[in-house]
Each structure stands twice: as C-alpha cells, then as structure tokens.
Regions:
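Short, surface-exposed ligand-recognition loops at beta-strand->loop->(often short) alpha-helix junctions
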Residues: 27-33, 40, 121-126, 264-272
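Short, solvent-exposed amphipathic alpha-helical segments in soluble enzyme
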Residues: 40-46, 96-103, 135-136, 185-191, ...
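Acidic, proline/glycine-enriched N-terminal capping motif
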Residues: 1-68
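Acidic, low-complexity central loop/insert segments
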Residues: 15-18, 24-25, 70-212
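Anionic-ligand-binding alpha/beta catalytic cores of soluble enzymes and soluble regulatory domains
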Residues: 172-264
Length: 339
C-alpha cells in the first residue's frame, strides 16, 4: 500500500530533504579536465566559465543513458554529481571514466563524497532560504560557495515538461558541523510554512513535477530525448563524444517512437502494482508502454506516475491498462493541478 504524502508546503513554500546517503561527488582535476570530459559528455563543457552549472549524460556508443550528472565548473576543478548514492555505484562510475583516461591525458579523478553531507531545498522559496548560507562575495552563478565551507548547485529547469521546477538547490556541507547548519536551515524552512521531506516525500514531489530520475526513467533502455531532456542536457553544436552519432541522427533525421508522459490511475487499484510494469492499449491489449514510477499524491488527488508510452498512445486522455486490470490515463506533465 502506497503512503499518501501531502507535498503542498513544498510546492507553495519550500521542502528540505536531508539525504540519508550522501550523493556521489567526483572532482576532475588537471589541465585537460575540460577536454577530457568534452569527449565523454553529451553536454558542452569546453570553455565554460567558473560558476557554470550544466546537466548532461555519459552515453553508450549507441547513445543509451549510462550515467547522468550535474557538472559544476570551479576555478581549480570540475565537479561531477551523478545520481548515485553508494560506494559500489561510485566505483562503477569512476571505472567508466577511467576507461577513457589515457596515459598522456593531464587529468585526475578524485572522490569528494566522504567529505560532505548532502541535502536539497525545493520549492519557490528555496533560493531565499539558501541565500543566508552563501558566501556574500560569491558570484550569482549556478555553483555558489557557502560561507562556512561547501557549495550549492542551483539547478536550472529539469526537462522540457517542467522548465521551472519552482527551485531545486543541492547543498554540500562539510561533514564536520553539518548537523548544526542543517538544523538551522530546517528551522527556517518550517518557520516559513515549508516542510521536511523524507525520501518518500521527495519522490512524490519529483513525480508530481514530472522530473525523470535514475534509475526509474534514466537508464540504458532510453535516449535523452525520450525523457524530454535533450534541450537541457544535450549540445548539438559541440564536437565528437561517445554516442554523438545516434543522438544527432535522432534529432535531425528521425522521430521518437516513445516518450515520457504523466500517468493517472483511473479508478481503484484492482491489484498491487510493481514497477516497471507493461502498459497496454485498452481497446486491443497491444503493447503501449512501460510504467516507471508511481506514487500516491494528495496534491494530485490520487495515484500518479511517469511512463514511457509509444507514439499513437501518448496523447493526453489516452486510456491504458495493465495485465491485471488496473486502468490508467495519460496526462500532461507536470502532473500538478492546473490553476
């Protein structure tokens, strides 16, 4: 049974998520750090100035998503923050990068995960609440230094469906003393009518906003464009990188056969829903897509989710079913009620 969580304070004020596991953070150092990443990421990194924050993917040669990452450019290094949270996942990420780190490349990799505690602020008041933490001399950039150590990533819009996520700021606080700083931040969030979000609450907020995530939506089965992230995460003007040819061909010569859409449960559950789950056309039971995320949303009035749905079935209002008789309906993203 899914737990219903009311995320309205996060959508109207702010939500604070204190990570139970620190998000992986890797630094790339050395004179060739930008050119090294330029040949791996689908995002343009070369020539970016310090303070720049970008989002991109590390792709397979067939342009399928292997890893996502926020990329923060600092004066002395480039920070990579993939959506990974365990030592094993970090080791796999580093192993992938090292495959392309040739002998003469003047670049080194280092884990910075253990030095920090991570947290996230979401909602329209996220920036106002985070500002007291910023170094007053820090530039107005996507990557901000914090006055007592650490830094913040101010995410731009996440995806074509949600160009303004209402504010999403990732914080990295030095592990020593992080507890007191986070407690002070939590007090400010609550005093302004916001809320603290646990892992389930942040997942509900994410799905309501229509934000695709690793591994549910972003994995080796999909291209960036299918998730609606090519505008945010892909540069079509840069030079060669792993997976470039299929990405470019899809953009200029092809068309999507499936894309990410919102899903609403139509009626009560007939059976328990496990993920991922095949979705069928309600009129003839042919394969129509795959349900990837499902949450119980107070804001949206019931269970909502995300799904990759095939062309011909992805229009809003399209009825779909699963193999157990549960009925769903395609919905526009984001899934929040229209004002």
């Amino acid at each position: 049974m899914m737990t219903s969580i009311d995320t309205r304070p996060s959508h109207t004020r702010a939500g604070l998520h204190m990570a139970t596991r620190t998000r992986v953070l890797v630094s790339v150092n050395g004179d060739d750090r930008a050119s090294f990443l330029q040949g791996l990421l689908c995002q343009d990194i070369a020539g970016q100035t310090p303070g720049t924050l970008r989002y991109g993917f590390f792709l397979s040669p067939k342009a399928r998503i292997l890893f996502d990452s926020w990329i923060g450019v600092l004066p002395d290094r480039i920070l990579l923050s993939p959506s990974l949270f365990s030592k094993e996942e970090e080791e796999a990420f580093l192993a992938h990068l090292k495959k392309y780190l040739f002998f003469r490349t003047k670049a080194t990799l280092a884990s910075e995960t253990g030095a920090f505690i991570s947290a996230s602020l979401v909602g329209p008041e996220a920036l106002a609440l985070a500002t007291p933490l910023f170094d007053p001399e820090a530039e107005d950039e996507g990557v901000r230094r914090l006055s007592e150590g650490g830094f913040a990533f101010l995410r731009p819009g996440i995806g074509a469906f949600d160009t303004d996520a209402g504010g999403w700021i990732d914080l990295w606080l030095p592990a020593e003393g992080a507890g007191d700083r986070l407690k002070g931040l939590e007090d400010r969030v609550l005093s302004r009518g916001g809320q603290r979000l646990d892992d389930t609450g942040l997942e509900v907020y994410r799905v309501e906003r229509g934000i695709p995530a690793v591994p549910s939506e972003l994995n080796e089965s999909h291209f960036p464009a299918e998730a609606g992230l090519d505008t945010l995460a892909v540069s079509y003007n840069k030079g060669c990188y792993v997976g470039q040819e299929p990405v470019t061909r899809l953009k200029f010569q092809g068309q999507l056969s499936r894309k990410l859409v919102g899903i609403r449960l139509d009626g009560p559950f007939v059976s328990e829903v496990t993920l991922p789950r095949h979705l069928l056309a309600s009129n003839d039971n042919t394969e129509a897509g795959t349900l990837t995320s499902l949450v119980s949303s107070v804001v949206c009035g019931g269970p909502v989710g995300l799904a990759y749905v095939k062309r011909g079935h992805w229009d809003s209002g399209e009825p779909l079913i699963d193999g157990e008789g549960n009925r769903f309906e395609v919905s526009e993203l984001p899934l929040l009620p229209r004002e």
